[in-house]
Curated annotation (Swiss-Prot):
This is Small ribosomal subunit protein bS6. Residues 120-131 have a biased composition (Acidic residues). The lineage of its organism: Bacteria, Pseudomonadati, Pseudomonadota, Gammaproteobacteria, Enterobacterales. Pfam families: Ribosomal_S6 (PF01250). It comes from the Bacteria. Residues 98-131 are annotated as: Disordered.
Length: 131
């Protein structure tokens, strides 16, 4: 079996359907004895340019190991699903399991925000004890 990176973008009005779509696609992959190495739901993001007069889309990234038949089936499903506005399937040489740069950046922002919040509460507590 080969390794693939799959990214698909869902119409923002159909964001509530994304968990069900992910579930169906993962079931199709695992049902054919494939493996999912990484699954990331990036959520709603701004598009670089408008697609069908849309400026935002819901992004999902999957790194999988699956037979070609399943990948063909997924591509057909993407093509005929009106909620999927763009999709891309790329073959990769190796399984990618580490977090993507998108998720790493999000985690770093969260850590900085938490550190800042902790510093401000520590400063506020220090100010209260001095009085």
């Amino acid at each position: 079996m080969r390794h693939y990176e799959i990214v698909f973008m869902v119409h923002p009005d159909q964001s509530e359907q994304v968990p069900g779509m992910i579930e169906r696609y993962t079931a199709a992959i695992t049902g054919a004895e494939g493996k999912i190495h990484r699954l990331e739901d990036w959520g709603r993001r701004q598009l670089a340019y408008p697609i069908n007069k849309l400026h935002k889309a819901h992004y999902v990234l999957m790194n999988v190991e699956a037979p070609q038949e399943v990948i063909d089936e997924l591509e057909t499903t993407f093509r005929f699903n009106d909620a999927v506005i763009r999709s891309m399937v790329m073959r990769t040489k190796h399984a990618v399991t580490e977090a993507s740069p998108m998720v790493k950046a999000k985690d770093e922002r969260r850590e900085r925000r938490d550190d800042f919040a902790n510093e401000t509460t520590d400063d506020a507590e220090a100010g209260d004890s001095e009085e």
